[in-house]
UniProtKB/Swiss-Prot annotation:
Enzyme Commission number, as recorded: 2.7.1.2
UniProt catalytic activity: D-glucose + ATP = D-glucose 6-phosphate + ADP + H(+)
Induction context: Transcribed from its own promoter, as well as another upstream of the preceeding gene (AC P40182). Expressed when grown on glucose or galactose, levels decrease as cells enter stationary phase.
Protein name: Glucokinase
Amino acid sequence: MGLTIGVDIGGTKIAAGVVDEEGNILSTHKVPTPTTPEAIVDAIASAVEGARVGHEIVAVGIGAAGYVNRQRSTVYFAPNIDWRQEPLKEKVEARVGLPVVVENDANAAAWGEYKFGGGKGHRNVICITLGTGLGGGIIIGNKLRRGHFGVAAEFGHIRMVPDGLLCGCGSQGCWEQYASGRALVRYAKQRANATPERAEVLLALGDGTPDGIEGKHISVAARQGCPVAVDSYRELARWAGAGLADLASLFDPSAFIVGGGLSDEGDLVLDPIRKSYKRWLVGGNWRPVADVIAAQLGNKAGLVGAADLAREPDPIM
């Protein structure tokens, strides 16, 4: 079909990239993310125009955080942008003069990993992103499954603990409250408060107090064998693996692809997740067990996936 542009709307920058049919990024253009909804639309158009210079572009795919309708045109609701029933497709098309599709950013990243990253060779995969929160995407039979209204795969808000921790969504006990970057930092702070003698390495990396602990400190301390840091990763993995076991019962994929910032830690995170997953998988000793694979595209997955989805007339069900 030719070259397409993928757009990734980040908290601080909007990135647009020209992507070929093999998932290669040929050029990129980045602009700062504005603070107002209409200015963000203008910034998306600016990023697209900057990236398309010198290329013949056939379509644009935009990855947006929030709920996107099944027609891939309107953002129902975006938690960090004041978009409510935002006709994003229509507005961007009017500015850039190209066909535009809009996709949930986690779905776009999942598609990118499935098509060009860790999911290559699989027909049925579940992707989860372990970052500040927890997101994901469902690919079954080589199709991205979005549900009847287009808002499936909000895995982070599956209720794991009835009457559990309060979530930013307004519910309680959501999975991302127990398996995410925020959860990891909370575990480390709690453990450092309770047993500071087991957190000396970790505390020394910050300001010397539990409140000063950051995610980057936990990674460094864990690799140095700090007991509190290692235990914090194990607790995160316990919840992540338990959730994967539930998803296996629902979807029976051949593989789980784990992406997001926490996946950059490699086997420090993935090995205990695999162990927890097998521990909680019903009939795990007697049935085939899906692989748990690290994502390969890093922060490029959303841009590449959005660009590729723009080529498809309707790949989503």
